[in-house]
Amino acid sequence: MSETVTVDSMKPQQIERETRRTQLNRGELAERIARAVPRDGRAEPLKGLRLLRVSSPTEQVHSVSDPAFCVIAQGSKEVLLGDDRYQYDPMHYLLATAELPIVSHVIEASQERPYLSLSVKLDPTLVGSVMVEAGHVSPRSHADVRAINVSPLDASLLDAVVRLVRLLDTPAEASFLAPLITREIVYRLLVGEQGGRLRNIAVQDSHTHRITRAVEQLRKELDQPLRIDDIARELGMSVSSVPADR
């Protein structure tokens, strides 16, 4: 009985320590990104790691998403994909699993507290390798085929992100350790809430992969009449599944 009471009495302390660690990590992440990008703009200090600083809310920007894991250290952002809107902040991460046209804009940013974020590019080969090593099987269904979604950023995933950014201070170590921490991030994503979606990018015949191929083909044929039926037939998809701005 006394042992149970002791364990129960530790729970609030554990929660408090975890909360404190998360707060410290968020603060450190913002500080390190601000130091790495001292003025508004982008930087890629490590291969596949992109940093962004913005000092005021932005207008909507049209771009093409890459498969990437995105974290905000300070501020907030909204991403639009078709009719869907995804808003995230330092307590959430965004996972993009396909190369698709999106619209995005920074919502919360100021000179005193600029928008600070990072993204880690996700290589399908790396995802597949981590899946094999971790013993994850490929998804058998495509229940969630959304190319973008937002989830809570847990303490373990945030901790790995902070360790990756710390490597900016030690370039000699970064070349060896950055790939290892990136693998850890991929692993934690695979076992997390969006693991099923992430596994799709490593499967060559997945719905997400076919959508990406369709977009790539549309890009190559911008100067040609749009033939949705032909593209759908070639990719083995239904006409309604092929992305097009109709």
Question: What residues fall within each predicted segment?
Answer:
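Basic/polar phosphate-binding segments, predominantly the helix-turn-helix DNA-binding elements
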Residues: 184, 188-194, 204, 219-221, ...
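N-terminal regulatory/effector-sensing and dimerization cores
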Residues: 41-138
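A short, N-terminal "cap"/entry segment at the start of jelly-roll beta-barrel domains
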Residues: 1-45, 50-52, 58-60, 140-146
